[in-house]
Amino acid sequence: MKNKKWMINLAISNLLLVFLGVGLVIPVLPPLKEQMHFSGTTMGMMISIFAIAQLIASPAAGYLSDKVGRKKLIALGMIIFSFSELLFGLAQVKAVFYISRALGGIAAALLMPSVTAYVADLTTLAERAKAMGKVSAAISGGFIIGPGVGGFIAKFGIRVPFYVAALLAFVGFILSMTVLKESEKTMDINPEATQSSFLDILKNPMFTSLFVVILISSFGLQAFESIYSIMATINFGFTMSEIALIITVSGILALFFQLFLFDWIVEKIGELHLIHLTFFASALFIAVIAFTGNRITVALSTFVIFLAFDLFRPAVTTYLSKHAGDQQGAINGLNSTFTSFGNILGPLAAGMMFDINHFFPYYISAIILFGTGILSMLMTRKRKQANF
């Protein structure tokens, strides 16, 4: 039992190291933009390239984790991420920055399904929610700790955080190769089964309906989240330090819930009801922000919205992992694909809506999330009828 917990924590720690590395570089992106004389379009391209690479690579990565093993994919993801951060730190031209971001997206595609599947392999259904809460907490923790540490490290040079991120990922690679043990449930699938495996998953209406919900909800979440800082500044006059405080408090709140309360909530109401609750809560409080002029109300509503977002993701992952059977990698790979697709479209749509009217992203996000909540409830009824 202790050995199993150690292996789970080691796998999850890789995600912590990666997202700590991602968080480290956040404070230095604005000065790097100025140093390299990059346009906003160039910086946006770097974000999009990462997401597109992750989108394209996720299905294959999920299948490969079932075929060749979680450990190999986790280790490969860590070394690719390490190289991508090192390359970004050394880059002097746009093309190299773009290549670095593409490699980072591929690394994320390799890591997310593999770590999630690894954790699912080593946990019982009763243990699953708590373990998936830890997976999400590792991501949240990296984003919370990273920017503060990155701001301090950047005093030694604005590219130093990239080198530190590369080093952290390399440490994770070494630990994965030398200490992490392969899970016993890894499948050995013949090549002919690859296509039929994905087709079987996508032909299953219960999985497909949930993937549609994931896609639509990711679009709505990112339409709000991606330009929150800009909207808060222009619409309500928040300073950057105030926005940073709101986001930090939101992250700490999410971390607490993911680590200590997520499994209790799932035990009480179940993953599907939690998913419904997060949709309706986020839609309601986004609408509150859209129609209030009170800054305190905006801040408190933001806490609820970001908490709902951070409970939705592990709830979906937990539910999928409980029904994935021997296709943990493939299912989680498709989950990452549909999430990435929504993450790409959401910010683009939000930016265009913001140019038309500064409050349009609020209205559209609230409508989409409320509609997705209704859709997910209807689909839940069908799942119950199908005993899924």
Give the positions of each predicted feature:
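Short amphipathic helix-loop junctions that connect adjacent transmembrane helices
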Residues: 27-40, 227-242
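Helix-to-loop junctions at the C-terminal end of transmembrane segments
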Residues: 58-69, 257-270, 354
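Paired small-residue
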Residues: 84, 95-103, 296-304
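C-terminal transmembrane helical hairpin of 12-TM major facilitator-type secondary transporters
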Residues: 272-316
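Cytoplasmic helix-loop-helix junction between adjacent transmembrane helices
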Residues: 100-141
